[in-house]
């Protein structure tokens, strides 16, 4: 594997499939990905365009805070993660089920 492929797979971790992401995909042509915690909007845009061969319009990224959880009366927390909402240009699409 060359270094550019490693960088792409280092930025994009996995697609996030949920009711909200499915609805956004159908209505607004927006796809949701879990990305690396140090990934920028430009990194995500370049990775999606090169991996799926599509044109990206807008990228929005946000940090999801980890939840506090308890297990057998011991406190703990889940780690936080970063996700990206990627809007494609009209006429473009990604088959998320095949890419998983």
Curated annotation (Swiss-Prot):
Molecular functions per Gene Ontology: rRNA binding; structural constituent of ribosome
Transmembrane segments: none
Keyword flag Secreted: no
Keywords attached to this entry: Ribonucleoprotein, Ribosomal protein, RNA-binding, rRNA-binding
One GO process term, biological-process aspect: translation
Superkingdom per UniProt: Bacteria
UniProt key word Zinc-finger: no
Assigned GO CC terms: ribonucleoprotein complex; ribosome
Subunit structure and binding partners: Part of the 50S ribosomal subunit. Contacts protein L29, and trigger factor when it is bound to the ribosome.
Family: Belongs to the universal ribosomal protein uL23 family.
Role, per record: One of the early assembly proteins it binds 23S rRNA. One of the proteins that surrounds the polypeptide exit tunnel on the outside of the ribosome. Forms the main docking site for trigger factor binding to the ribosome.
Name of the molecule in the record: Large ribosomal subunit protein uL23
Organism: Xylella fastidiosa (strain M12)
Lineage start: Bacteria, Pseudomonadati, Pseudomonadota, Gammaproteobacteria, Lysobacterales
Gene name tied to this protein: rplW
